[in-house]
Amino acid sequence: MAAKDRLPIFPSRGAQTLMKSRLAGATKGHGLLKKKADALQMRFRLILGKIIETKTLMGQVMKEAAFSLAEVKFTTGDINQIVLQNVTKAQIKIRTKKDNVAGVTLPIFEPYTDGVDTYELAGLARGGQQLAKLKKNYQSAVRLLVQLASLQTSFVTLDDVIKVTNRRVNAIEHVIIPRINRTIEYIISELDELEREEFYRLKKIQDKKREARKASDKLRAEQRLLGQMAEAQEVQNILDEDGDEDLLF
């Protein structure tokens, strides 16, 4: 096993416990990130469907608005001067809200009407009905544009977050967890090798102690035998000396 395929750590029981704890944390984090990615993916697909639906509806609304504008121009003539004379401030404004999806903040744009209708009396002389229809159609178009902008902003935000989350999930699944597993295997193999070496060392020590004990027992036996032989020789010498004296007298 190459050193780059595992974490640089000294093999010990404490290191093994630490790596098992890190493995449990990485596995739990992988599961949580996977659930987050799935939740974001579901919301992503939902927003994508709404974008397609809104764009389809947007085409129809803009077509009706363009047709209404043509009707107004045909009925009342050029209304540019009327609009410019009555314009003061925007009637449709936007407020921003926030939505939280699995820890991701998504901006939401909502249109609202502020103040009175500036062009309420415009076109009463002629073409008032067509002008009212034109205002209604373009207000619907503006609201759809705001809704579409909100959806597309959320779409882009979710797309970026999903890519980052998937990269983290893949990194944990294919890099971090396998590296921790290889580190644990390395620690276990090194500890087993140390245990075998310790067992062999203890066995050699026991063998040496056994040999030393046998040598000591053998030496004591020899010394005891020599002592017994010396005592027997001494007794024999005493007996021999006693016999010689009897012969002389």
From Swiss-Prot:
A GO molecular function term, named singly, is: proton-transporting ATPase activity, rotational mechanism
Q: What's in the keyword line of the UniProt record?
A: Hydrogen ion transport, Ion transport, Transport
InterPro entries to which the protein is assigned, alphabetical: V_ATPase_D (IPR002699)
- Identify the NCBIfam families for this entry: V_ATPase_subD
Is Isomerase one of the keywords?
A: no
Q: Does the keyword Transport belong to this entry?
A: yes
Specify the taxonomic lineage: Eukaryota, Metazoa, Ecdysozoa, Arthropoda, Hexapoda
Pfam annotation, one family: ATP-synt_D
Record protein name field: V-type proton ATPase subunit D 2
In the record, the note on similarity to other proteins reads: Belongs to the V-ATPase D subunit family.
* Subunit structure as annotated in this protein's UniProt entry: V-ATPase is a heteromultimeric enzyme made up of two complexes: the ATP-hydrolytic V1 complex and the proton translocation V0 complex. The V1 complex consists of three catalytic AB heterodimers that form a heterohexamer, three peripheral stalks each consisting of EG heterodimers, one central rotor including subunits D and F, and the regulatory subunits C and H. The proton translocation complex V0 consists of the proton transport subunit a, a ring of proteolipid subunits c9c'', rotary subunit d, subunits e and f, and the accessory subunits VhaAC45 and ATP6AP2.
Q: Name one GO cellular component term.
A: proton-transporting V-type ATPase complex
Residues in the signal sequence: none
What this protein is reported to do is described as: Subunit of the V1 complex of vacuolar(H+)-ATPase (V-ATPase), a multisubunit enzyme composed of a peripheral complex (V1) that hydrolyzes ATP and a membrane integral complex (V0) that translocates protons. V-ATPase is responsible for acidifying and maintaining the pH of intracellular compartments and in some cell types, is targeted to the plasma membrane, where it is responsible for acidifying the extracellular environment.
Output the GO biological process annotations, alphabetical, semicolon-separated.
Answer: proton transmembrane transport
